[in-house]
Amino acid sequence: MADPEATKYPLLKLLTYRQTTITDHHKQRPNDDDLQTPQTPPSPLQSCSVQTPPWTIEQHVLQLTAQTSSGLCVVLTLHL
């Protein structure tokens, strides 16, 4: 019988578990200056749109949207 989680979330199969040590983590970490992106001004607080899916992918951008229990809309944008 197939794993229901694998059927429901097929991308989870792409993730693998890898145990790292603290020294490995620090060796692989790129320079913070390389990771910084231009700052955008904060937008006014608004609730998440009910019509917005929890994640979207457009070209090289993955955008995750969630709403906290207090009603704050959190949007995480990853540039791939």
UniProtKB/Swiss-Prot annotation:
Q: Give me the stretches of Basic and acidic residues compositional bias.
A: 23-32
Q: Name one GO biological process term.
A: symbiont-mediated arrest of host cell cycle during G2/M transition
| Residues spanning the signal sequence | none
Q: How is it modified after translation?
A: Phosphorylated by host ERK. The phosphorylation triggers a structural change that enhances keratin binding and protein stability.
Q: Which UniProt keywords apply?
A: Early protein, Host cytoplasm, Host G2/M cell cycle arrest by virus, Host nucleus, Host-virus interaction, Modulation of host cell cycle by virus, Phosphoprotein
Q: Which GO terms describe its cellular component?
A: host cell cytoplasm; host cell nucleus
Q: Which InterPro entries does the record match to this protein?
A: Papilloma_E4
Q: Which domain of life is it from?
A: Viruses
Spell out the subcellular localization from the entry. Answer: Host cytoplasm; Host nucleus
Say which family it is in: Belongs to the papillomaviridae E4 protein family.
Kindly give any further remark recorded in the entry.
The major E4 form is first synthesized as an E1^E4 fusion protein from spliced E1^E4 transcripts, such that the first few amino acids of the E4 protein are derived from the N terminus of E1.
Q: What is this protein called?
A: Protein E4
Q: Which organism is it from?
A: Human papillomavirus 33
